[in-house]
């Protein structure tokens, strides 16, 4: 009897693990979309290393104009001092995180969606390259998230045939 229970429990754990992997792959293939008509109002704080990584990845130079690129925002697991952490990724590289207060309001607003369990939101990012000194340049990222995160659910568009309508 105990052996049967252990076999069933182990089988259930494997099935749950496979489900989580398949769910994550599905979420990456079909992220939520954000209404592209929103203004670029949310600035992502970038550290020096993130700026250098972004400049190398996208081969950014100072003489370029503003660049528009697709980015993903995705909720991460909670940390000791932060319950809601939302990362910003470009080309599968984490470049920064949303500010904690904005991230908390955004997560609470989208709590009834798959975003809360890890489904990313695809949106446009505006990258501006500026010159820090004669030999060094930096960059700034603005996202077209709504200025008020408590209205975000009005702008999220689901991206598959089952969820073709707005949230």
Regions found by a protein language model. Give the residues of each.
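Conserved active-site motif detector
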Residues: 1-167
């Amino acid at each position: 009897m105990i052996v049967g229970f252990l076999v069933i429990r182990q089988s259930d754990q494997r099935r749950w693990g496979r489900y989580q992997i398949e769910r994550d792959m599905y979420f990456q293939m079909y992220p939520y979309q954000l209404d592209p008509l929103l203004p670029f109002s949310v600035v992502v704080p970038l550290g020096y290393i993130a700026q250098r990584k972004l400049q190398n990845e996208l081969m950014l130079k100072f003489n370029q104009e503003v660049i528009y690129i697709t980015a993903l925002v995705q909720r991460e697991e909670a940390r000791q001092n932060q319950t809601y952490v939302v990362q910003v990724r470009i080309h599968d590289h984490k470049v920064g995180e949303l500010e904690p207060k904005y991230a908390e309001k955004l997560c609470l607003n989208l709590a009834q969606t798959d975003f809360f369990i890890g489904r990313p939101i695809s949106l446009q990012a505006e990258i501006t390259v500026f010159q820090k000194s004669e030999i060094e340049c930096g960059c700034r990222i603005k996202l077209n998230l709504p200025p008020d995160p408590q209205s975000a659910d009005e702008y999220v568009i689901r991206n598959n045939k089952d969820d073709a309508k707005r949230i």
